[in-house]
Swiss-Prot record:
Organism: Arabidopsis thaliana
Record remark: domains: IQ domain mediates interaction with calmodulin.
Alphabetized SUPFAM superfamilies for the sequence: P-loop containing nucleoside triphosphate hydrolases
Protein name: Myosin-12
Protein keywords: Actin-binding, ATP-binding, Calmodulin-binding, Coiled coil, Motor protein, Myosin, Nucleotide-binding, Repeat
Upper taxonomic lineage: Eukaryota, Viridiplantae, Streptophyta, Embryophyta, Tracheophyta
InterPro entries per record: Dilute_dom, IQ_motif_EF-hand-BS, Kinesin_motor_dom_sf, Myosin_head_motor_dom-like, Myosin_N, MyosinXI_CBD, MYSc_Myo11, P-loop_NTPase
Amino acid sequence: MGTPVNITLGSHVWVEDPELAWISGEVTEIKGTNAKIVTANGKTVVASISSIYPKDTEAPPAGVDDMTKLAYLHEPGVLHNLDCRFALNEIYTYTGNILIAVNPFQRLPHLYSVHMMEQYKGAAFGELSPHLFAVADTSYRAMINEARSQSILVSGESGAGKTETTKMLMRYLAFMGGRSDTEGRSVEQQVLESNPVLEAFGNAKTVKNNNSSRFGKFVEIQFDKRGKISGAAIRTYLLERSRVCQVSDPERNYHCFYMLCAAPPEEAKKFKVGDPRTFHYLNQTNCYEVSNVDDAREYLETRNAMDIVGIGQEAQDAIFRVVAAILHLGNVNFIKGEEADSSKLRDDKSRYHLQTAAELLMCNEKMMEDSLCKRVIVTPDGNITKPLDPESAASNRDALAKTVYSRLFDWIVDKINSSIGQDPDAKSLIGVLDIYGFESFKINSFEQLCINLTNEKLQQHFNQHVFKMEQEEYTREEINWSYVEFVDNQDVLDLIEKKPGGIIALLDEACMFPKSTHETFAQKMYQTYKGHKRFSKPKLAQTAFTVNHYAGDVTYSAEQFLDKNKDYVVAEHQALLDASKCSFVANLFPPLPEDASKQSKFSSIGTRFKQQLQALMETLNTTEPHYIRCVKPNAVLKPGIFENDNVLNQLRCGGVLEAIRISCAGYPTKRAFDEFLDRFVMLATDVPEGSDEKSACASICNKMGLKGYQIGKTKIFLRAGQMAELDARRTEVLAGATKLIQRQIRTYLTRKEFLGQKRATIYMQKLWRAKLARKLYQNMRREAASICIQKNIRAHRARKNYTKLQASATVIQTGLRTMSARNKHRHRRRTKAAIIIQREWRRHQVHEAYKKHKKATLALQCLWRAKVARKELKNLRMAARETGALKEAKDKLEKRVEELTWRLELEKNQKADLEDAKAQEIAKLQNNLTELQEKLDEAYAAIIRDKEAAKLAIEQAPPIIKEVPVVDNTQLELLNSQNNELEVEVAKLKGKIKEFEVKCFALENDSRASVTEAEDAKSKAVEFQEIIERLHTNLSNLESENQVLRQQALAASTSVEEIGELNSLKDKVAILESENETLRRQTESAEKTMPPARVFASEKNLENEHQTKEIQATKEPRNPINVLAKQGSLTDRQQESHEVLMKCLTDERRFDNEKSVAAWIVYKALLQWRLFEAEKTNIFDRIVHKIRSSIEGQDDTRELAYWLTTSSTLLYLLQSTLKFSNTNNAASRRNRSSHATLFGRLVQGMQPSSVGLETSSGYSGMAGIPNDQQMVEAKYPALLFKQHLAAYVEKTYGMIRDKLKKEINPLLNLCIHAPRPTRAKTLRDVTKSIHLTTIAKQQASYVQWQNIVNKLEHTLTFMAENHVPSMITRKLFHQVFSYINVQLFNSLLLRRECCSVSNGEYLKMGLHELEQWCLKADDEATRSPWDELQHIRQAVMFLVSHQKTQKSLDEIAKEICPVLSIPQVYRIGTMFWDDKYGTQGLSPEVINQMRKLMTEDSANMTYPSFLLDVDSSIPFSVEDVSQSFHGGNISLSDVDPSPLLRQRSDFHFLFQTLPE
């Protein structure tokens, strides 16, 4: 494995340990060839230097992704690396291009999600973290690019996860080469669903695995030219037939037996099965159930999988009937018969099971019994029937059971292959080999020999491939490798399969002799292979032998070799089953050809297996192989347990260590020049300045005295042990440098201490001098203070005497001033009292004069009021004389009331007459309708006949231009006449209504005094309302007649040439119907404006006039020719206007006051022309087609931004104007229902928006916010047009977003990893190189990040130039920044080399560039998206944070990475490595806490993926678009149309001045 190296004191090494296989330790003493080592667990051991291996102390604590990067490639290094990665749930590791997969024994769904597949799609091998998807993608890409078939070889022992790995590989290949769901049930689906079927009949529970494959499987997936799966085939190898009859405890038989026993009661009754404990083939073990497996559910799932792979229900029943027959066959027991060496059925129970088996197989019971108890020997003289003893009969029974099951399994495989189908035109294929691993048990039999032969073959193929890869690298680096050799295992293969002389050849020879036994066979082998280095005989063994395989010695027992090797069907069994009434069973045993039956050539399992194996190897030799080695970490099948001995044994059996041996035979250590110099630059202090890296590497090796190393073009290749020698010398140099540093530090510390003491002494002297100076100064201060005190005391005494004298004088002055103030106050009081007395007296005199004046005024007023009252009395007396006139008016009113009562009675009688007339008219109309329908059917039949006649006439005669007659002009004239009469009638109604209003107003004034008359007037108003409703009914009848007339006009045409005329007539009828609708609305509006209290005066006249109008409308037909001509010219003008509008939509690409002029013109025109209310029009389709043709295939962001603004503006205008139509016809409703599923999300936005619009929303140019009266009642075409607009807004937005993503995606791939700096050439160049490297790194980093910023800036500019709504722009940048966050974050978590401190600083600098751009931009749309980068920002913050080992989980989760989930923090924490300062990552306690939390989540089925998903949805709705426009000024009154429209009179409505 490795060459012994020189071990020095203090070296860290690996030493063998009986419990842990290998354990690390430190060398404390060396004596001769032995070394004393203190291990990691504290023990002291003595080991030979040749048996220990150096340990790389600088290896990352989380291990390396590729073990070829290990400094020491040996067993303990490989084992430790796998252990470290397994502890972090990193189950995949590379060894070159070999993938090692360690079974975690727990669900890790995040590793196999579709998003994870997307990450590995197209990624270079080794670019991302190790994964089986990377192997599958590499094989797929190689097949596509090199047009060469590939193969993926999955191996490992039972329980290592081969089956699941194979499933995931096939799932990824189906993901890469699968077809769309619309192409029906795909091949890849059938291949994937074949796994449960094959597992049911080919897998069983063993000691090591609950779902062990007991057969080999090679799946060939075929691909066409496009790389899509076009076919597949499944090849199986060596089914373990003996398991059908013999099962050891605690294993189980094949799953299908237990599934059938757990089937539903009706199924179990049909197949006559029950408890598995009652069957001999199942009760040989105590294990009947598997934990966490429901056999009943598995049975149903297997039946469902059979349906998918093409096995019909009848065939399924036949299959399980055969399975049940095998179970019953095992319960048939025998005892000695009456004759010698004969046998018979033991009891009635055996008879029952025999009958049941015969019934299930549909064969003869007696014939089955004879085939089990007797044997027919064919001789030249005739057939001889020989009875069998009970033991032979039981063996014969077991042989029948094994043969039937083997044939059944082969039929299932063939059926699956035929159902899937193979592509004979396939250009290439990818084969996935799921083969049993190397096996070595306590008792090994014939199956283990075949399995191990397969592994020897595959190992030889593997060794050749590994050696080939090594040779290719040597050739690529142009080094001499001719003397590199590797050990081959051809001698073992010759020992087993060589013909003649091999073990299988001897076995076939022994099987052809009837008297051969396993003892004679074993003796033959002992004699033949005596002295063979790969063959040995165990001591005291009679039938055992040992073969030295590449993975170790295996001892086989030859006791059952002869029976297991025989591959022939007993003639009686063949005849029995061939005669079965069940076609399925008979087809399992087809009759042998006559010539084949006459041949006596021997056929054996071993020979057939060799042929299959040889065919497999030939297939593999034509493909490019890829290897996956599955490893089972422990024998208890539990997560989190890594057993070193178990794993090490599997690495040996899987050939991984053999690959390492091959690598060690050449140059196991390969390092790039810069990496080599980084590690050993301190050994090159005397390298001349200016030397290149290659020369520097050679100088280091020569200086160290290395022999046999090679210098390639980009790497240096070291022999085994030379890396350790360099590390030892490096350790010495570092130790010397350490001593030098320590000496210098001690000198520095001593001198620092001396200087400190010196400074302290000087400081103390300074303090003492300062103290003496302060004392002298204090004495001087005291003397000065004494003088100051004396001065102040003298001043105090003088001030005290002066203060006493001043106080006495002040007292005397106070008394004098007080006496003077009292005298002044007394004088003021007397003066004030006198003034008050004078004021009161004067007030009294004035009051008396006022009272006298008031009394005189009241007397004068009384006299005047009496005069006025007398005058009023005189007027009242004159009014009393007019009482007689009032009485006369009262009499007139009473007469008028009587007249109105008479009219009411008359009107009731007329109403009854009208009801009778109405009933007769309805019956008459029903008869007319029936006659018209019959005429319509006859007209359609005539049209069909005329079409055929016209075709015949066209073929037989030259074209003749004929005048097209109008067959039913009278009816069209009648239709137009009725419409005109209705218009006249409505005009007269309006006049009458005005007259009624005048009369009712006068009558209302006259009847105010009478409450009774008012109530009568109200009742009359109600009756008049009923009359109006009858008018509506008559109008509806007229519309029905119009509909009938239109159908008759359409049916009247009798020639093919009249189809165009009919279409025009349809349009004209539609126009007339719209006019009817307008008249209806006018009638309703007139009704609403007429007060109900004013309409009863002339209701009788109105009804009579309306009846008169109806009679006249039926008698005055009009000529429709002039009307149709006038309408035709109108249609041409409309078409021309439509063309101008479409031209305007295309050419009017400008914005007026940040508004799309084209959108406004289109909206205004559609509104003015009333096209939103049209039942049919093609202008909407033309607009949609124009938008679609303009954006499809468009790659210009500016162009897309323009159409995004135009379509969103038009969508908003429609959203603010249109409302649902409640009167759409049934056809429109049907059409709407057909589109409900396509635009279901948009229909909600069709309700009238509350958002206002300061523009024209009516037909007369009114402006302002549309209310319920101004909202346009849209028909179905307008509704569909709005839905199309919404769809194209979303599509255009998605195109801009995806284009920007596509542009920045390659830049993100370059930005995720910091540019690798140029390494220092020599030690003296280190300082200069670091400076230059820093500058180059900064310059390189700015380029890629600045390119991203430029792309964002350009997109923002285009959006601003075209005035895209700010909401849409903001959503766009939110999604783009979210995409940047997802891509950078996922790439960071999938690449360990990116999770470093220097790379974190590089990403931090790049993110700072994005942040600066967001802050500098004036648009608000670029400020908020910065929050979308929170995942990558927090991940970068974690990478660049210091002292990670001291941080707790709570601190990390709440302060550093609050947004990241526990799996994400765990992933980045375990992948982190410090390439700048050499510090450690998170503490083991934090790692264990996170692992515990993730384990709990996994148990709760909530284990999330650590990767982020890309959001590709449309992040806004129609309401959001409306809200975005509502936030600004949407007034369209100031938009200036183009000169082209100014010249056209039909667009003058665009220039109308809006009312104030």
